[in-house]
Amino acid sequence: MTNENTTQAIKKPGFWIGLILFTCFFFISPESASLTQDAWFVLAVMTLMVVWWLTETISIYVTALIPLILLPILTSANFQEVALPYANQTIFLFLGGFILAIAIEKVNLHKRFAYFILSRNGTTLKSILFSFMIIAYLTSMWIINTATAMMLLPIATYVCRTTNSSDPRFEVLLLLGIAYGATIGGMATIVGTAPNIFFVGYMAENYDIHISFYEWSKVALPLSLVILMSAYLVLSQSINKNSTDHKIITTKLTQMSMNEKKVALIFILTIGAWVFRGQLTSIQLLSNLTDAGIAITAAFFLFIIPSQNKKKELLEWRDMHQLPWGLVLLFGGGLALAKSIMTSGLANWIGNNLEFLTQYSAFALVLILVICVIFLTEILSNTALTLSFLPIVSMVAINLQMSVQMLGTILVIAASCAFMLPIATPPNAVIFASGKIRVYEMAKQGIILNVISIFILIGCFQLLIS
């Protein structure tokens, strides 16, 4: 789940439960001598933030400010030390990537891409479904999945109206395909969705492991493609086999504008630099080049390259009202909390108390983790779930002598496998808001895909450890 609004019944208890649990730490002394006072109060802050994040008592972005307020007061860390993670380089990767996405939307390059694919697809209902899912998948790698779903919804409605399909279920399946494609596409790249960005920052901040754009996509891209094809097979099986062929009437593509060409060139150069950064850093002048640096460089040029209207640039600062500034605080708050867990000794204490897990097989523990995360993310924010679970999962990985990076990657991708409910992801919510899909229809297809995703992720885990 990624939308902020929950029922009032959840909000009020969540606020008081978090506050009461936090207050209890002031009246209970730590039983373990290995747990320092700093670690004890970090545990108190973590408890408060996790409860408020999971129940969304107040905005998850506001909750992310708590480390800046409480950690300098309750622990030996000063404000500057706590504030440093709020400027983690991963946050600048997010900002640069999102600014590039805003430019793509501004010149309607994404719509051109969508119509280009549709104008070259087949005439069967299955090929139409596949085309829309591929468009949603590829677009949401770079553009926020909510915008992807909103862009494709009217196009899909138009296509369904012009095909006059004899299969009454086709429109429902097509809209679900858009939602699923948009959600799955976000898994494939670092900038595709918030949990990916947070995880990369978490690994760099706490384990000095720097995951490049290429390294992430090397694992996540094929994995997401397998999930995408599974989603297509699930949905296409419900299409009436006796349906006739249809010709899609699409808007005739005009010649690319100069603005579209300029943004497309910057986009291609940015992707190329991300993919081939390893080769670029062999050049002495570029030896310190990072994915974040590439993203910010691309964003910078979008603000200085003139548009067709010579009085303006491709992007202006007023375009930045679309930037989700709250996510910057959310990443910073999560990274600040994670860093304090590590530096205070709380991480070691948690690890020591999880030693009993070593008696169980890694396969069983990962299976339980994946099942819990996939079904919890149907009702909880996938970002909040990642923020809350990642420090604990890291300690489990260390106890089991497993790669923190590997187990964390499985967790993060599982957090995006939410296909059952309208509240599970923004694309689901957008499609449901069209009024053309019932909850039962979404849940019926979604639970099948959830179960398939469990098997795919476990298979991926087995492949990685081998």
Question: What are the functions of these language-model segments?
Answer:
Residues M1-L93, E215-N352, I448-I454, I458-S466:
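Hydrophobic transmembrane alpha-helices of multi-pass small-molecule transporters
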Residues T148-L153, T157, V172-V200, A220-H246:
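Transmembrane-helix bundle segments that line or gate the permeation/cavity pathway
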Residues E31, L48, Y61-V62, I66-P168, ...:
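Membrane-embedded alpha-helical segments and adjacent helix-loop junctions characteristic
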Residues E205-S212, S394-M406, I465-S466:
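Helix-coil boundary and interhelical linker segments in multi-pass alpha-helical membrane proteins
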Residues L70, V200-D208, K436-V439:
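Interfacial segments of multi-pass membrane proteins
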Residues F94, L125-T139, S165-G185, I211-V219, ...:
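Alpha-helical transmembrane segments of multi-pass membrane proteins
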Residues A433-I452:
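Interfacial loop-to-transmembrane junctions
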